[in-house]
């Protein structure tokens, strides 16, 4: 009391600038177990706020629960959450565990009402009960009404998304926050080994579902005057202007890049009422990383896949070399059907295969009696299935043996005992991956799911951010590829001359002018022997033929309308014209003109968004999956074009596709270095990030198409091989050139 009085006197006299305020907490009035913690929490509240309690003596309540309604003291970050999101109604997909579950928990502590949706009811019930108990301890009134659950929700199912929105509206009357957290890990295979249905499933569950829910909540959020949408992406989906290669998970990388690119390009359309952002966690110390329910953890799965793919790539390379040396496919597969490394070292076995088996047998095994079977067996049946698929997609298997003989060969293959891969090597590789990840983290540690959720809850409280991606893992020191590089210069004549007499494939539908410009340049400067134009419809071929006119060499162009049978069309082109020196892939459909009813009454519905993904992303995957198996080919992927006079919605969605596509290009560039075919892949962008830089008239449009043609020729001309220069061979792959 004297201290306080002296401080006030000194402030009045000018001897002290700031007032020192004093209180004392008397603890003798409380004997409960949590009394000291409660006193500490109240002390922190007094010290770190500007509150001035007139009473000098502050007595502890004899019963904390009766006095506060809380069964435990609240201090630290929990106290800082109180009221942060008070009254908000939240829909969280994938809310039964992991980051989604922790977001639900912390938002509920922050005062929000949450609807947690997921597939497994038992996990949802356990989490809900846990959150309710915590809310009761904090002192929330009727906490069981603040946390609702909805099970059997698969975000790949459109009807489940409709059900989720309806259930949230029924429970709370409104939706203030949408958190798109649910998703799948993907097929975890190299792109050439991915099945199209697996690719589509990943993109539908992780990306199309996000847009579908966004489309459903935007009108109601606009009407109520506020809203917040959060996409849970991943650092391996890249960041603004940057693509991060993620080998063996191209479908996942593309879906996560799409989630991020979506918010960057939708923000201007949903504001000012609605904020839309993404978070991009890096590796998180949690259930998915460690594994659960008998499923191996992420690092263990990646380690096993890396080691299996190393063997598969060795086998694939040996088969290609044996065929190049003159062996028949029947002879190679006939030798391999024993699946016995020892037997395959005999002189009558094709040399390339025999040399590989000698090398495998000589590898150190770490023990006299290895407990794994890869020392004696070439491959597992799943590996054999992938090898046959590679030969089939690489157009090395005649149509007659596509199914019957190939399937019989796989079924007749002796099955190696488990484990196939040395568990000690898997463990060592997993540790290597883990240490590599730790070394890339700025914090030199992986955050927990709670760490990520806590940072995100505070991020969501900022009302001045939209269209951005937040990295709650502290960021990664990762190899990165800039998404947009300007086109400067042209292909060197000595490189272009190496294309003389070769075959080029141009694949597309509606982009007749750019394709015609590229064809003219290939004929005039590349002096290619033939061009195969693969279109979806015959009308598109006619449009390209018209755009070409009587260009020099136009008679060296053949046209094929493949419809939706793209792979079969490429097979036919390969059979008729041989291995292409370069393949240029352009989208099979234009970008829609509308989005959220901003321009006109039309809007981009979820099925139309799904079609956009199919024609602009999956289309390129289907091309790349085959062409990456053509030894000697170069692959160029083209992002969509927005014609002069296009809408803002078209421009936004074209940039969305461009950014998302480069996640695939960058990843494929790394993966293809590991394949024996070593096909370089690059991307050419026709859409710029700034709309003011887009062509305004026909003359500027023609200039852009000329630049496009030169960019395509630059990427299509033969580049240096890895054995000549590892450095140059590497930096020329996975790039994106903007024209």
Q: What positions do the PLM features span?
A:
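Catalytic loop of short-chain dehydrogenase/reductase
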Residues: 230-258, 263-264, 268-271, 283-285, ...
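C-terminal substrate-recognition "lid" of short-chain dehydrogenase/reductases
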Residues: 321-327, 331-334, 338, 378, ...
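Substrate-binding pocket helix/loop in short-chain dehydrogenase/reductase
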Residues: 189-191, 198-200, 437, 594-610
């Amino acid at each position: 009391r004297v201290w306080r009085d002296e401080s006030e006197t000194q402030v009045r006299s000018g001897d002290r600038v700031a007032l020192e305020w004093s209180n004392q907490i008397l603890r003798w009035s409380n004997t409960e177990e949590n009394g000291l913690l409660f006193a500490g929490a109240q002390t922190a509240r007094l010290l770190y706020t500007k509150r001035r309690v007139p009473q000098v003596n502050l007595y502890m309540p004899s019963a904390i629960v009766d006095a506060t309604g809380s069964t435990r003291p609240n201090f630290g970050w929990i106290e800082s959450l109180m009221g942060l999101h008070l009254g908000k109604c939240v829909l969280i997909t994938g809310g039964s565990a992991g980051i989604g579950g922790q977001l639900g928990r912390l938002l509920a502590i922050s005062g929000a009402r949450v609807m947690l949706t997921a597939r497994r009811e038992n996990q949802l019930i356990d989490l809900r009960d846990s959150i309710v108990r915590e809310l009761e301890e904090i002192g929330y009134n009727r906490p069981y009404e603040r946390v609702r659950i909805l099970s059997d929700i698969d975000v790949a199912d459109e009807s489940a998304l409709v059900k989720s929105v309806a259930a949230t509206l029924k429970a709370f009357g409104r939706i203030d926050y949408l958190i798109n957290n649910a998703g799948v890990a993907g097929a975890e295979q190299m792109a050439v080994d991915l099945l199209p249905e697996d690719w589509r499933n990943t993109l539908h569950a992780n990306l199309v579902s996000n847009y579908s829910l966004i489309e459903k909540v935007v009108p109601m959020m606009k009407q109520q005057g506020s809203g917040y949408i959060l996409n849970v992406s991943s650092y391996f989906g890249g960041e603004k202007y940057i693509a991060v290669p993620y080998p063996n998970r191209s479908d996942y990388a593309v879906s996560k890049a799409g989630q991020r690119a979506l918010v960057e390009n939708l923000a201007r359309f949903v504001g000012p009422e609605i904020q839309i952002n993404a978070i991009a966690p890096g590796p998180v110390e949690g259930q998915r990383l460690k594994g659960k329910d008998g499923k191996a953890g992420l690092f263990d799965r990646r380690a096993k896949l890396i080691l299996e793919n190393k063997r598969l790539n060795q086998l694939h390379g040996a088969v290609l070399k044996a065929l190049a040396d003159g062996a028949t496919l029947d002879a190679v597969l006939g030798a391999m059907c024993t699946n016995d490394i020892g037997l395959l070292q005999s002189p009558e076995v094709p040399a390339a295969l025999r040399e590989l088996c000698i090398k495998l047998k000589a590898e150190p095994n770490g023990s006299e009696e290895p407990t794994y079977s890869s020392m004696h067996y070439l491959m597992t049946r799943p590996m054999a299935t992938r090898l046959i698929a590679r030969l089939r997609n690489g157009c090395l298997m005649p149509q007659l043996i596509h199914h019957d003989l190939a399937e019989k060969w796989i079924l007749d293959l002796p099955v190696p005992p488990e484990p196939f891969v040395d568990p000690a090597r898997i463990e060592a590789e997993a540790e290597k991956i883990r240490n590599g990840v730790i070394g890339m983290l700025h914090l030199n540690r992986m955050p927990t799911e709670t760490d990520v959720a806590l940072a995100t809850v505070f991020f969501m409280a900022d009302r001045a951010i939209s269209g951005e991606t937040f990295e709650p893992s502290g960021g990664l020191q990762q190899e990165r590829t800039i998404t947009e590089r300007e086109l400067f210069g042209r292909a060197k004549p000595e490189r272009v001359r190496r294309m003389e007499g070769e075959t080029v494939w141009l694949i597309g539908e509606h982009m007749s002018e750019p394709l015609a410009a590229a064809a003219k340049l290939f004929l005039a400067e590349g002096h290619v022997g033939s061009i195969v134009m693969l279109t979806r419809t015959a009308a598109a071929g006619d449009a390209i033929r018209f755009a070409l006119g009587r260009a020099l060499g136009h008679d060296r162009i053949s046209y094929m309308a493949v419809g939706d049978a793209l792979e079969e069309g490429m097979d036919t082109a390969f059979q008729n014209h041989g291995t292409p020196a370069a393949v240029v892939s352009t989208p099979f459909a234009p970008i829609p003109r509308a989005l959220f009813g901003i321009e006109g009454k039309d809007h981009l519905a979820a099925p139309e968004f799904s079609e956009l993904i199919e024609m602009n992303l999956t289309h390129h995957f289907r091309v790349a999956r085959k062409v990456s198996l053509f030894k000697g080919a170069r692959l160029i992927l083209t992002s969509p074009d927005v014609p002069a006079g296009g809408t803002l919605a078209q421009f936004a969605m074209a940039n969305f596709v461009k950014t998302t596509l480069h996640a695939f290009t960058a990843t494929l560039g790394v993966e293809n270095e590991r394949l024996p075919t070593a096909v370089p892949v690059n991307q050419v962008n026709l859409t710029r990030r700034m709309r003011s830089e887009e062509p305004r008239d026909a003359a500027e449009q023609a200039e852009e198409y000329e630049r496009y043609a030169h960019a395509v020729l630059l990427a299509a001309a033969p580049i240096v091989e890895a054995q000549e220069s590892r450095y140059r061979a590497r930096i020329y792959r996975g790039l994106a050139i903007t024209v």
